[in-house]
């Protein structure tokens, strides 16, 4: 299940980025919900909030390590744990989605722009964020279950 989730995220991420790159000019902004949500063709050579700009080798190494750890966790820790499988699949898909951009373009295509100063993001970023949140939720649930079983 984790690998299926990852493949779906990678496919959606790459399809949406391809649509942005082929259908929008760099810097073009299309309102979806005025003052709230926009499609905005943007490129990022760093991470969220513009940190680590141009540090591609750093991202290559870190992403490779993260992907390896996630695959290890899927194979060893996620058996029988649906929430953990989904969480790890989301993180894996998000990590690989942005990794593909860095390998092919030397930058990441971002296009979801919300109100305020929130960073522009993409499907891979969303999957990573949701996956990490579900991973943390799983840790809390497992801790609570272990606490109950020792009573």
UniProtKB/Swiss-Prot annotation:
Annotated function: This protein specifically catalyzes the removal of signal peptides from prolipoproteins.
Enzyme Commission code(s) on record: 3.4.23.36
GO cellular component, one term: plasma membrane
Compartments reported by the entry: Cell membrane
Active site: residue positions: 110, 125
Family: Belongs to the peptidase A8 family.
Residue stretches spanning the membrane: 54-74, 83-103, 120-140
Protein name: Lipoprotein signal peptidase
